[in-house]
Amino acid sequence: MFAKNSKAYSVYLLFRFVCSLAVSMSTVLSIVYHLEVVQLDAFQLVLVGTVQETSCFLFEMPTGVVADLYSRRRSVLIGMFLYGLGFLMEGALPWFATVLLAQVVWGCGDTFITGALEAWIASEEEDKPIDKVFLRGSQMGQIGGVLGVVLGTLLGNINLQMPVILGGSLCLLLGLVLGRIMPETNFSPAIEERQGLLKDFVCLFKLNLGFVKGAPVLLTLLAITLCGGLASEGFDRLSTAHFLDDTVIPVIGPLNSVTWFGVISLIGSGLGILASQLLIARMEKKGTVSRTSVVMSTSAGYILCLVLFAVGRSFWFMLLVFLLAGLMRTIKEPVLAAWMNDHVDEKMRATVFSTSGQLDSLGQIIGGPIVGLVAQQVSIPWGLVCTAFLLLPALFLVPVAGKKRD
């Protein structure tokens, strides 16, 4: 691999595979672990998720600034060590307080990686088509995620703490390996003359804000990201409940309801890997793809599949549209990231990508309670329909982004 491709590209693919494997292994049975080992009640479970999302939201911008001021490579390494520390803390110390603290630690680690990784590979591989790089990275992440789900499930049947601890250990090991092999040759700090961390942070924040305001395409793409965040939380939180409450899950041999969800996850990942490969093959044949068409069609397809999933009552029909909805998101995200990359100043890449991640988290924080309230007061299907409606503004924003020029 290292002989055929550049070192940075190979390291990027290795990172996406191993990191996804470790995180999937650690989290695949996290709710079961929290219920059976830590013995959390319903309120505590919700609080764990809230602390995690809030940590990601609060740390996203500061860590992006660190990556653009000091080093994207260093930011990724810090993130991996925080990932490992957070998972080890959660798995080794099964108490509510340490689980909450672990969410803060690995949530902070996630923000050190988000934005910095994309900015690092975009700078190191300026001559490669970034759409293909992001799609191939997404594909490797999905393959690692599938393996992580399988390993996590097998290990969890032995001991529920084991996959969390081993996943954390793998994150630490990956951090050590990256410290030896991860290059950084094209980085230049966003601010050459330093005035102290706080002043540098404020200065870069103002530069970033001014740049985004003066870039209409980027501003529109960030608004599309916010819409995606608004429409993701309801789908992620309510889809399982919709399967359990509004249809009959067939029992086929060993496939009970619990096993079915693992199988569905694996099928979804497999479809994502295949779709990414087909899109990469099309890019290699034609040289490029229309980002406007891809983002528009996948957004519209996601809305349609979500509505059909909400009104469905047949298990097989619901399974089909559920998988298609997930596929739409899998295809859209790397293409949207590549589109955004083309309108970002090189020195502020990590900060802008972190802003995108922050808007996605903000959308989830806002959209989740709205959809949850509708599901609680009316019904789960109506909550899912509400989720679809929250993405509708994106259908008007995508053509606008396609026509504008920075």
Q: PLM features: what roles do these ranges have?
A:
Residues V32, E36, V146-G167, A241-I252, ...:
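Transmembrane alpha-helix termini and helix-breaking/packing motifs in multi-pass membrane transporters
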Residues V76, T292-V295:
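Primarily marks hydrophobic transmembrane alpha-helices of the MFS/SLC 12-helix fold
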Residues M1-S6, I181-L222:
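Juxtamembrane intracellular "pre-TM" segments in multi-pass secondary transporters
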Residues F81-W95, A300-R313:
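C-terminal ends and interior cores of transmembrane alpha-helices
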Residues I165-G167, L172-R194, P399-D406:
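Helix-loop junctions on the cytosolic side of multi-pass membrane transporters
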Residues F2-F57, V217-S265:
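Helix-loop boundary and gating motifs at the non-cytosolic
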Residues V104-I143:
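Cytoplasmic helix-loop-helix junction between adjacent transmembrane helices
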Residues C56-P94:
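Conserved MFS/SLC helix-loop-helix module at the cytosolic interface between two early adjacent transmembrane helices
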